[in-house]
């Protein structure tokens, strides 16, 4: 079985295809691994960065991992693609995300935030059970 921790990471073929497409458009592309030193890596290159094409899933097993690169880019005043740190933080908290979209009138299914030991309450089967802080299908079996 594939390791769920890496379920959202892009494979080498996708990274190469995006790199090639950007280079065909005349971009000088440099791939930067997202590791514990990502702030330093961005800071030392910031004078030469026109845009960070942010496709990172961030640091392994960190709840706010997707917000790290956009946060650092904003702090260093480096333009980047994708969502803001606040958006990434809100989308990783499913209850908050559902409340935000419901407030704006987007229909959303009823939900209940559960912690170990909680009772099901008034929800009935069929149900979708999803970890509150994961993206895509991580945590669903």
Predicted regions and their residues:
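ATP-binding N-terminal substructure of ATP-dependent carboxylate-amine bond-forming enzymes
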Residues: 1-79, 115-118
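Hydrophobic beta-strand scaffold residues
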Residues: 29, 79-80, 108, 127
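Active-site nucleotide/adenylate-binding loops and adjacent lid/helix of ATP-dependent enzymes
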Residues: 45-46, 89-141
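A short, structured active-site edge motif that brings together acidic residues
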Residues: 82-87
């Amino acid at each position: 079985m594939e390791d769920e921790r890496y379920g959202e990471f892009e494979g080498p073929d996708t990274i190469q295809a995006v790199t090639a497409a950007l280079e065909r458009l005349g971009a000088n592309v440099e791939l930067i691994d997202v590791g514990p030193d990502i702030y330093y890596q961005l800071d030392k290159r910031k004078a030469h960065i026109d845009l960070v094409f942010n496709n990172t899933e961030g640091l392994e097993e960190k709840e706010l991992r997707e917000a790290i690169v956009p946060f650092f880019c904003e702090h260093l005043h480096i333009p980047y693609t994708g969502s803001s740190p606040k958006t990434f933080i809100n989308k990783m908290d499913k209850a908050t995300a559902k409340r935000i979209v419901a407030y704006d009138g987007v229909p959303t299914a009823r939900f209940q935030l559960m912690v170990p030991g909680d009772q099901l309450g008034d929800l009935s089967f069929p149900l979708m059970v999803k970890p509150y802080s994961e993206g895509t299908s991580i945590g669903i079996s």
